[in-house]
Amino acid sequence: MAKESYKREKPHVNIGTIGHVDHGKTTLTAAITKVLSEKGQAQKMDFDEIDKAPEEKERGITISTSHVEYETPSRHYAHIDCPGHADYVKNMITGAAQMDGAILVVAATDGPMPQTREHILLAKQVNVPSIVVFMNKVDIADPELIELVEMELRELLSSYGFPGDDIPIIQGSALGALNGEAEWVGKIEELMEAVDNYIPTPVRDVDKPFLMPVEDVFSISGRGTVGTGRIERGVIKINEEVELVGIRPTKKSVVTGIEMFRKLLDQGEAGDNAGLLLRGVNKDELERGMVIAKPGSITPHTKFKAEVYILKKEEGGRHTPFFNGYRPQFYFRTTDVTGSVNLPDGVEMVMPGDNLSIEAELIAPIAMDEGLRFAIREGGRTVGAGTVTSIIE
């Protein structure tokens, strides 16, 4: 019996390998599982198993991603690795695999390459909080070059708003570690220590301010109006004050009942599908697409900047480019809102398969904060995906 008290849940952290093609992301992922499996902290996965990533659909977009799990003495990790550059772009923009931190893999033989830059920029845009660097292939690189690459990397990271001078850069050889060479195995252990210590533990959804997107609205005669949906974050208790945000003017209310699977509860929390009974709200004051949230925690907006990915024709996207003033629907949480797209200076048109920064203006306000994901749709068909990077008004 006494054993039970030691069973503490380790904090869970989502990470991924990012970086230029052929710099060793997948080899590193395989090396991490091999080194940790020898301590009983992972299931060893070979390069080929990780490389043939299964396809998944997220917001109508097909993405190939490999998921690997492992643990260190202090944490449990879910690690993603993507086979192709486009999969990374799609993954980061759709938030299909939310990353709490990333391991940037850079080959010492090449230094930073175009996709290295693009992945750092994307990580910044979509709010990946921190990066640890693994400089790979140092066993076959010129020692003087290694020093230059490290300086260049620190400058590059700083130029995109990451703390380049403080970021841990571990020099190693993923292949050497995979082959069991002691010197390089030690570097994988050093990398995991850096990831443990440098990437902050994320705030759990339950600990964030309460928010539930409204999926459906019912009225119960004599009792009031019920909004149903899946609680996205936080905890709600009976008699707590909430705000109804988005589409219409913001309105305050009090939750007088919480129902889940036809049972009455005294509280609901992140992940629960619940119905909230709201005091003093008419059925026509609440609709799908609004959110019920902790007062003051989120505000409605119509103008924002976003990083978007536009699907290729083969992915079911548009067959033709679009131009400034393009008016699709933006699908936020549970509903579509029409909006217009303003392209950056110097961009004449956007081709299927492109990713870029845009400004958008919606015809109705939506509850939003930075990092909110959305789909871009035309007549119910997904043609792109995006992340809100900043709010204009």
Curated annotation (Swiss-Prot):
Broad class of enzyme this protein falls into: hydrolase
Region of interest (G3), residue spans: 81-84
Catalyses which reaction(s): GTP + H2O = GDP + phosphate + H(+)
Name this polypeptide is given: Elongation factor Tu
Natural source organism: Chloroherpeton thalassium (strain ATCC 35110 / GB-78)
Domain of life: Bacteria
Region (G4) location: 136-139
Primary location: cytoplasm
Keyword Protein biosynthesis: yes
Record key words, sorted: Cytoplasm, Elongation factor, GTP-binding, Hydrolase, Magnesium, Metal-binding, Nucleotide-binding, Protein biosynthesis
Self-association state and partner proteins as the record states: Monomer.
Region span, G2: 60-64
